[in-house]
Amino acid sequence: MLLKIDCVWEHNGNDSLLYAVDYIGAYTRGESLEIAKAKMPGEIASYLKWLGEDAPDSIEAVVVEEKESELDIKDADSDVLFESEKAPLTADEYEKLKSLALKSAMDFLALYKSIPDKSATAIAERKTFYGQVPRTADEMYEHTKNVNEYYFAEINVDADNNGNIYECRKRGYEALEAKPDFLQNTVIEGSYGEGWSLRKVLRHFIWHDRIHAKAMYRMASKVFGVAKIENPFCF
């Protein structure tokens, strides 16, 4: 069976980020669209395994939307708002997406906790648009956890980064749910004129988790061996 994956292509020149529209947070990167598309079957197979589902025999990425960007796409800087992220949410849809974002946080925490020495690294120093690339498990965890306040603030929700990654994210959703009209998914102009919506925030959490979980898992596997590291994301 062939599974066609609708994708949004964000690019700066040829540098490409490719996002799976219906598999929230699933993404690939590449020096060209062709490279990013070639990686998508593996990403979707991993994502489905993470969900406890079987992957089909064949997966094909199909670009349905394009965003040309001036950002450092090669470093996963992104400001795209999908057309599909502008529609209101049903309560069931929201609960499903929230559950995925909270599962992602719990799995990120499990991966982090499994690493024997959280100050070890096998990654060279490198600077990106947001500063030095996180190199140790501690640095990756803190960086990933500490977008919580920022992401929620972009849709006018007061949140913080206190506690672990799951706890602060869960509190953020509780603060969101105190707003009577949150399911309307209003599009808001946030920092630097970037468009945000609740749907985008839900995607961003899982996408950002996956970026740094992949980096953490690969680094830790190199240092300690795969047998010693949890792999809840099924990379």
Segments and roles (model prediction):
Residues 87-115, 160-189, 196-213:
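Acidic/histidine-rich alpha-helical segments that form the ligand environment
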Residues 6-33, 37-62, 122-166, 191-235:
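Short, contiguous alpha-helical
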Residues 1-5:
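Extreme N-terminal starter segment of soluble prokaryotic enzymes
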Residues 14, 20, 73-84, 183-185:
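Short alpha-helical hairpin
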Residues 76-88, 101-125, 141-150:
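A short mid-domain helix/strand-loop element embedded in enzyme catalytic domains
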Residues 115-118, 147-155, 175, 179-183, ...:
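A short secondary-structure junction motif
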